[in-house]
């Protein structure tokens, strides 16, 4: 039981709430408390029926409980915590702004493409931003080889393409969102 208090005290606030929200949303769907049909993002339901929670839950549901959820949560804890801690002061507000901009950008993207659940695209965008803010890190890919951080998103795109056989257009759009955000916030004089 000492794990939960330690997690709460050591995880930055925005990352903590996203991780807990993802865990609770995924468990609620998997245990049948909520149907995934009630939480996926759909513009018609969002605008016409006023189901505004869908704009948040689309980023908090990963899929069936299993290895993908565990890997996703470990990613969030590791990379998003580092990104939140390295955000400019005040850290929590700066990182929350980043998360909200990425969420909004992905929601706009979902208007033009089918993206009922955006958690994986959100994590990919955050991975892209993290990789460029921490370019000297090396990440082990499947324990087979090491890659410098800026190349990790591209290796992930290639692995998804090889695994599914489907061109990962939405991953590339997520990378573009991350690139624009990184360029505007780190290189722009505006």
UniProtKB/Swiss-Prot annotation:
Gene Ontology annotations of biological process type: endoplasmic reticulum unfolded protein response; ERAD pathway
Keyword field contains Transmembrane: yes
Major localisation: endoplasmic reticulum
Keywords for the protein's UniProt record, in alphabetical order: Endoplasmic reticulum, Membrane, Transmembrane, Transmembrane helix
SUPFAM superfamilies the UniProt entry points to: Rhomboid-like (SSF144091)
Membrane-spanning ranges: 17-37, 56-76, 99-119, 139-159, 164-184
GO cellular component: endoplasmic reticulum; endoplasmic reticulum membrane
GO molecular function: signal recognition particle binding
Membrane topology field: Multi-pass membrane protein
Keyword Magnesium: no
Residue numbers on the Lumenal membrane side: 38-55, 120-138, 185-190
UniProt topological domain (Cytoplasmic) ranges: 1-16, 77-98, 160-163
InterPro entries per record: DER1, Rhomboid-like_sf
Subcellular localization, as worded in the UniProt entry: Endoplasmic reticulum membrane
Disulfide bond entries: none
Family, per entry: Belongs to the derlin family.
Stated name of the protein: Uncharacterized derlin-like protein C1687.17c
């Amino acid at each position: 039981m000492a794990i939960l208090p330690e997690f709460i005290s050591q995880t930055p606030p925005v990352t903590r709430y996203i991780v807990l929200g993802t865990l609770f949303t995924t468990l609620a769907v998997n245990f049948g408390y909520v149907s995934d049909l009630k939480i996926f993002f759909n513009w018609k339901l969002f605008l016409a029926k006023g189901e505004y929670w869908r704009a948040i839950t689309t980023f908090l549901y990963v899929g069936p409980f299993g290895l993908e959820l565990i890997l996703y949560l470990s990613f969030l804890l590791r990379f998003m915590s580092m990104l939140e801690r390295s955000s400019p002061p005040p850290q929590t507000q700066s990182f929350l702004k980043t998360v909200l901009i990425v969420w909004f950008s992905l929601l706009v993207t979902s208007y033009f493409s089918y993206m009922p659940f955006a958690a994986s695209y959100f994590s990919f965008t955050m991975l892209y931003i993290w990789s460029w803010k921490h370019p000297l890190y090396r990440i082990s890919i499947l324990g087979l080889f090491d890659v410098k951080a800026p190349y990790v998103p591209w290796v992930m795109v290639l692995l998804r393409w090889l695994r599914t056989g489907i061109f990962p257009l939405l991953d590339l759009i997520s990378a573009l969102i991350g690139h624009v955000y990184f360029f505007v916030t780190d290189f722009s004089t505006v």
